[in-house]
């Protein structure tokens, strides 16, 4: 006998401050894969997916990227990794300030570690090669374990905006043994490396804790 399994989708209006408190109290009811739809101050709609969570925290990443291509580093160098990159500055200045105030107020400042032993504090960041793929093909950035959500290749594919076309986007990691290339994810959800001065899309990634 065949079995029909149906998924019930519910939509609820949320208040970021209240949700953040529930996340801290472990009473949010969120689960990996849940989506919160939000708009930037200039009207760009994005779906923020819960990709990972634990006691007192939840990590959100935009299902797709913002419709702007940016260089990892304008000088075409990868020295210093994400911590010293132009793309980190872009995310934490231009993109962060484009988010609604209610959301900005609950995004945590977190420490992000990288392959050269350095770390930096930021509110918005990019996933590393190891978080996306587990094994690192291009970097030596194995600081973090693979996020369960990204074990499904389809979840690594991001469009150039909500409702757009699958596109390339930067990861945080830089290519080992090469001074000019950084890791990116292609439109099929696979990892490659590209020159730091090239413009690629970026997702919005943050933690509430």
Predicted regions and their residues:
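Collagenous Gly-X-Y triple-helix signature in extracellular proteins
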Residues: 2-209
